[in-house]
Amino acid sequence: MESLSELQNPLLPRSPTHLHRPYPYPEAPPGWSCQEQLYSFLLGGAGPARAHQLLDPGSLQLAVEAWYRPSCLLGRDKVKEPKAGSCETSFTEAREPLAGPAEEGSEPGQAAEDVTIHTVSYGVQEELQGQEDSQEEESDGTSSESECEDAFLTLPPRDHLGLTLFSMLCCFWPLGIAAFYFSQGTSKAISKGDFRLASTTSRRALFLATLSIAVGAGLYVAVVVALAAYMSQNGHG
């Protein structure tokens, strides 16, 4: 150790010109005898070089340089670090933007598809419900009509015997006699089981009896008016 700086920093390299070299290991000066001693020590030589070997930072650097090139040793780490950093940044940058647009692009499509599915299913349900309701209404209408027809057919037609007798005796008797005839025909058709003929004769008997009553009532009114007019004329005379 020759100066105070070397005593304070014994492990620093001697030459400060290593900053502008391709690698930070300084070369030993040409007049330095430690290189020859290091080679003899590494090659297994004996003698004073091996016995009086001193600890020097330059010797450690030369020992590494003797077997490996410094650029290979340091270049590997220097190449790894930026590559690792670039891989991490490129991986994260490539992953995040790809995930974002994919999600943004897929979400509207999925929402629109869901809305379309719900709308179609809702329309189909409405159509099915409308068809079911219309079928139920039609079935109810047909069932009610059939029930009415069945009830009408099961009920035997009436002969209107009392009405025909009243029209024959108390009203216009020719129409009353015809109504009584159809009333008897209705009773015979019912006894035979011919409900179609019975309903026809029953309607005719009802019509003739009603007409006979109307005509008879008109005749009675006309007779009363004529009698009143005749009596009024006789009273004045």
Curated annotation (Swiss-Prot):
It is a multi-pass membrane protein. Residues 183-204 are cytoplasmic. Residues 1-23, 84-111, 127-148 are annotated as: Disordered. One of its GO terms (cellular component) is membrane. Pfam families: CD225 (PF04505). Its main location: membrane. Keywords: Golgi apparatus, Membrane, Transmembrane, Transmembrane helix. Residues 1-161, 226-237 are extracellular. Residues 129-148 have a biased composition (Acidic residues). It is found in: Membrane; Golgi apparatus, cis-Golgi network. This is Synapse differentiation-inducing gene protein 1-like. It comes from Mus musculus (Mouse).
